[in-house]
Amino acid sequence: MTEQASNGAAQDGQNAQFSLQRIYVRDLSFEAPKAPEIFRQDWKPSVQLDLNTRQKALDGGDFYEVVLSLSVTVKTGEEVAFIAEVQQAGIFLIKGLDAEAMGHTLGAFCPSLLFPYAREALDNLVVRGSFPALMLAPVNFDVLYAQELARMQAEGQASGTVQ
């Protein structure tokens, strides 16, 4: 019985399929509201990064769009130097995963593939805006996903529902 169960699990894993179909910029914006005056000030930046992900199933059920949104607001003193935003998206073919693996793939693995593209797009915008290069540190999407799961579980327990 155990051998049959483990063979079934191996077959399920063999049927799993993951493929990146396309990476694209969904939205991109840059604002320098205090230019050109901001260029004459001492450059002492403070950086605020907002990060968000979302995903949706596309027609056919095995294709998913994952969108990684990054918004960077940089201030020098109290003045906003610039705001740069990107929605970096990808289309992924994902088949044969259980619910837990699918959640992790869409919530952590796919965004980690998109992040280098989003980071490069933001850096390019900032440099073209005549500001120093923006070097965003790598993001551990596995940790962010685990934190989100823990938050959702805590909210479920607080409201009396089981997830």
From Swiss-Prot:
Keywords: Chaperone, Cytoplasm, Protein transport, Translocation, Transport. GO terms for molecular function: unfolded protein binding. GO terms for biological process: protein folding; protein tetramerization; protein transport. It is found in: Cytoplasm. The keyword Electron transport does not apply. Homotetramer, a dimer of dimers. One homotetramer interacts with 1 SecA dimer. This is Protein-export protein SecB. The gene is secB.
